[in-house]
Amino acid sequence: MSREKVYNFSAGPSMMPESVLNKAGSEISDYMGSGMSVMEMSHRSSLFGEIFAETKRKLRDALNVPDSHEILFLQGGATLQFAAIPLNLMGSGKCADYAVTGNFSGLAAKEAEKYGSVHIACDSSDRGHSYIPSELSLSAASSYFYYCANNTIYGTEWQSVPDTKGKTIVCDMSSDILSKPVDVSKFGLIYAGAQKNMAPAGLTVVIVDKALAGRQMDICPSV
């Protein structure tokens, strides 16, 4: 029975290429002759290890991620990073700069306040988040600067990476990752919920500079 193709233009989940859907469908019960579905195999098996390594390699190649940065595939949705980032990056100074230019950056700043001091580097709420501020006010005490690259609700997007004078940059790229070239080396951490531009919902991609390891707070859970 034929059916009319439905085109989804919502903010997420994103549409999948038909070739990808067909390939996934054909292998749902027997992945590459293994006799089992990917959903059934052990995550510690060599075959799943190959899937994981290939996925990582393809993303590293697509974004030209340097060896200085690690790629993580995490659970919990992108909003989990609202807490995970300050818990792991605020450090002993417990201070961070946040650019509030939309709904999600505002929520991220509010969550970060639970773990330390949040300095608002810029705020576009005075005009309904209809613009990206041209200037930043950075705190000398902050350990990183946070911003959301593309604001789907308000329709604004940062056209270039903000100049933070060397301060670590953290960016939520959930809605524009893989849409254009990005110099990953400029960022301490990039994260993105997979469902808008990359894959089905349920996965968050984090790309983090290995040099930032070891800054976690004592209260950071071991998960």
Predicted ranges, named:
Residues K5-K56:
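A glycine-/small-polar-enriched, mobile loop at the entrance of the PLP active site in fold-type I
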Residues S10, L74-Q75, A99, A121-C122, ...:
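Short beta-strand segments
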Residues G12, A112, S124-I177:
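Active-site phosphate-binding strand-loop segment of PLP-dependent enzymes
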Residues S34-Q81, N88, G102-N103, K110-E111:
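Conserved N-terminal alpha-helix of the aminotransferase class I/II PLP-enzyme fold
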Residues T79-F145:
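PLP-dependent aminotransferase-like
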Residues N103-F104, D123-R127, N150-Y154, S174-I177, ...:
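Short acidic/polar capping segments at secondary-structure boundaries
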Residues V170, V184-Q195, T204:
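Conserved active-site segment immediately N-terminal to the catalytic lysine
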Residues A194-V223:
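Active-site C-terminal subdomain of aminotransferase-like
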